Amino acid sequence: LPGVQDPTAAKKIIGKTANLEFRMEANARTSPLRKEEFNFKENDFQTAYLEKAVIVSGDRVTNASTGFDESGFAQVNITLDMQGGRAMQKATSGNIGRRLGVLFVEQKTKSELVTNSLGESVIEQTTYIEKNIISLATVQAVLGTSFRITGVGTPAEASELALLLRAGALAAPMKFVEERTVGPSL
């Protein structure tokens, strides 16, 4: 993990499986069967409806880096592969003026203390998928292979998101079996 020196931070990143989904915001004419309601990542009380159809997912992301927009706020610069760029171009060319949602998809694990059949207390871990909106912005131009996501919070949060997206090429979750610290020696 380039730029990560702290083993705890590296474990946190490797243990997460993050992805993105780009979807158009549902409008009043969208059938209830073709839309889903999601919370915003930064505000659980704010929700929006997005179409169920995924335009592009994070597996099409070839690069993600951080930067700052014209107002000095953090942003994540995204580069898609050619297939992802074509899909994004097709979806946005007919939807200028509509809002495009960016969902942050994260696989999480929750631990729960349960009693097994022998009457013993054991910790049971359950994996679940959490999807939250990180951006819902108006499409102002046709998007292609390169664009940016704004409204991602602090520079540190933008940096973590970009790192997770680059590391998100890991299509399956990782579990730690063994941990060692290796350092340089003579």
Predicted regions and their residues:
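Extracytoplasmic/secreted envelope proteins and their assembly/folding machinery
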Residues: P7-I14, A158-A162, G183
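Conserved structured catalytic cores and adjacent interaction surfaces
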Residues: E179-L186
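Extended, hydrophilic extramembrane loops/domains of integral membrane proteins
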Residues: L143-E179
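Non-transmembrane, solvent-exposed regions of membrane trafficking/translocation machinery
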Residues: L1-T138, F147
